[in-house]
Swiss-Prot record:
<dbReference type="InterPro" id="IPR050058">
    <property type="entry name" value="Ala-tRNA_ligase"/>
</dbReference>
<dbReference type="Pfam" id="PF02272">
    <property type="entry name" value="DHHA1"/>
</dbReference>
<dbReference type="InterPro" id="IPR003156">
    <property type="entry name" value="DHHA1_dom"/>
</dbReference>
<keyword id="KW-0030">Aminoacyl-tRNA synthetase</keyword>
<dbReference type="InterPro" id="IPR045864">
    <property type="entry name" value="aa-tRNA-synth_II/BPL/LPL"/>
</dbReference>
<dbReference type="GO" id="GO:0006419">
    <property type="term" value="P:alanyl-tRNA aminoacylation"/>
</dbReference>
<feature type="binding site">
    <location>
        <position position="678"/>
    </location>
    <ligand>
        <name>Zn(2+)</name>
    </ligand>
</feature>
<keyword id="KW-0436">Ligase</keyword>
<keyword id="KW-0547">Nucleotide-binding</keyword>
<keyword id="KW-0963">Cytoplasm</keyword>
<keyword id="KW-0479">Metal-binding</keyword>
<dbReference type="GO" id="GO:0005524">
    <property type="term" value="F:ATP binding"/>
</dbReference>
<protein>
    <recommendedName>
        <fullName>Alanine--tRNA ligase</fullName>
        <ecNumber>6.1.1.7</ecNumber>
    </recommendedName>
</protein>
<dbReference type="InterPro" id="IPR018163">
    <property type="entry name" value="Thr/Ala-tRNA-synth_IIc_edit"/>
</dbReference>
<dbReference type="InterPro" id="IPR002318">
    <property type="entry name" value="Ala-tRNA-lgiase_IIc"/>
</dbReference>
<feature type="binding site">
    <location>
        <position position="575"/>
    </location>
    <ligand>
        <name>Zn(2+)</name>
    </ligand>
</feature>
<dbReference type="InterPro" id="IPR023033">
    <property type="entry name" value="Ala_tRNA_ligase_euk/bac"/>
</dbReference>
Amino acid sequence: MQTHEIRQRFTDHFVKSGHTEVPSASLILDDPNLLFVNAGMVPFKPYFLGQETPPFGTATSIQKCVRTLDIDEVGITTRHNTFFQMAGNFSFGQYFKEGAIKNAWTLLTNSVDDGGLGLNPDRLWVTVYEDDDEAAQLWHDLVGLPTERIQRLGMEDNYWHMGVPGPCGPCSEIYYDRGPAYGEDGGPAVDDSRFIEIWNLVFMEFERGETKPDGSFDIVGNLPKKNIDTGMGVERLAFLLQGVDNVYETDLLRPVIDTAEKLTGTRYGTQDKDDIRFRVIADHSRTALMLILDGVTPGNEGRGYILRRLIRRIIRSARLLGAQGAVIEQLLGTVREAMTPSYPEIEENWERIRSVGVTEEKAFLKTLESGSQLFEQFLTEARNSGTSVVPGAVAFSLHDTHGFPIDLTREMAEEASLTVDEAGFHELMAEQKARAKADSAAKKHVHADLSVYRAFIDSHPTHFTGYENTADEGKVLGLIVDGQLADRASAGQHAQVILDQTPFYAESGGQMADRGSLRGPGGLAKVVDVQKIAKKVWAHLIEVTEGELAIGELLEARVDQKWRHQARQAHSGTHLIHAALREVLGPTAVQAGSMNKPGYLRFDFSYGDQLTEKQLQQIEEIANSAVDTDYQVNTIETSLEEAKAMGAMALFGENYGKQVRVVEIGGPFSMELCGGIHVDHSSQIGPISVLGESSVGSGVRRIEAYTGMDSFRHLAADRSLVANLAANFKATSEEIPERIDALTAKLKAAEKQVQQLRAQQLAAQVGSIVDSAADVSGVKVLTQNLGEGLGAKELRSVAQDAIARFNSETAVVLFTSQDGEKVPFVAAANPQAVERGLKAGDLVKAFGAEVGGRGGGKPALAQGSGSDASGVDAGLAAVQRLVNEILS
């Protein structure tokens, strides 16, 4: 039975029994504590916690999930997958244990002709919580399961809770017996290789208290309603129903392994270490595609780092299996074919998915080549010196300079029977992060614990009136000073104010929050920011400038209209830029993020290549043409399904409610799901000036622009610059490019002439320089600062010339210079010196350590660059010391 059919039978079974079918949520939820959705119940969590009222009594879903905690175990065993699908049925006070058990048993054991999955009931076992007599009795009486196939296990195995005070309850797990070929008899309590868990039924009926020092907790009460949460692993059931040994042999993953065989020329099933790599490729390819589908792009932090790590593990595994060229497009293409029947949205987003994957592969292949050279160089040194540990500094250099994740360095080290000084690596990483933190202002945010807002979230959500008004009255429901609830806030204090209603827009959707003022009967405050808490409460960050504000007062909330107007211009301008981008670049240019503040916009989008100047001009012209056309801007409140049917664009990875807001500019020109504040007509945006574009990550570009008066001022500054250039060149504005080209050509010719003269001068001096070499234990040692203005190329030429002049004498040289802010340096050693242990690479490292740089190369010739010219003398002395130590 194909996986898609298993999914369909599951859904049909529960829909027929009255459950509401709920589509899978995105893998990315608006939860800072959750990297990815990792369980089927996660999207229903607010209902189970009582934070929201479910719009249905029972539901069923097949949820996309990603778990990356055991990413290093993938492939080593056949059990671990980073991406999986969790089929579940949920009841919110409608049915309990009897309904859950009956539903599961019926679907699993009914014949295929009757809509079931056709499992042999004689092969099914269950476990229940050791004290759950009711569940054990139901399994026996309701479905006829023999008592010997009902096993009781303890709290660790069969009791569900979230690790914190809240709902909890016993659970019951269903297992399938694969037969004696897979292990000994005795049920799941004895052998979890033979007995495979396929379904977990959680009976939520109690509320637990705080965790005690010994790890236990008390049951403090019953839940108002008894709930059901179940989860069935689709992939596990698929390999059982398809008659194969594990998930990697199913219709979802085996085709990816087949493609990998063709790409690498290696056969699966011949060597264990190769099989591990094949499974890594299959698992990670599927997960990477599903993450990109939901809007994740490769990066160096968080979700982006996970995706980057997966793609890089795919590429390296493929190369270790023998792949020579690119592999990502073909691997993702195979995943596309396997997954599209269940996720048709893959097809419409394929070009974007392909582009992100291929772009990351190109970048990593360059990284892999340069980083591998450095690692191989260290391996040679390690073998010579007998060390078994990769120093933290080497791992940090691979990460910082070549983009090697620490796990990749660890894998490469393990393959060479080495370990990595990860403590040293993390210490250097921490130092780097501390420096970065000191150099940048901390992002402002609401600095109170979320519990402070709990009462307002549950009972007093803020009513936003800002779509219609820029001024309104609001009652003070809460004041927070220094992270604690307070009765009042006085002049000079910074605080947060929660009102029952407000015209202030809270930062969201890329749009900065409004600024303005709050005035009460006894005080005045400046609003410096507004943050949305749990999507329900507006926290106004204020500075009290006069008197005081107090709980219960009625305040006049007034938005700074100039700020609001310019923010609206920027946000509407972003929509025009987005539409223009898609017109010029095609539908693969999909939004990856944005930021709008008064007069300025920044728009990130998925695209693999740098934009040309011509493309930027086209985008700017299309956007300004839309401004000139004076399109009407309409907002429409509608259902998510209707919005999609209208053609409204949604942000990938964003989770929308059933009701959404559509912003339409000029009918078909631009239509997006958006909760921001916009102009009424496109002409109100004013001129849009595109500043340029840049890369912000693998496969992600950023375009920046000014709007309104900021755009006008930018254009005026450009005009003034052109006028000054024209005056200096005594030319018209049209002639300036030609004059600059001519001047540049003259400058390059002069620089070339200077370099030639300098090279001739140095060549004439090499003889006298060589004569100044010192003799150390029969070795000619020459270290010298050759002054300013020499680059690596010139230093290399002098070093090679000098070393040649020593003829049969053993000799090493190191030369340095100051080239602007850089300190280039080159070392050379002739064969006789290398034989005595004097290697150019070692000299370069010793010198580089003193000038804030690093370098590398071969034993005969190496070079590097530093940034601290004050350390040149110390560097030359360090080289002398190293030579003395080696020769002593």
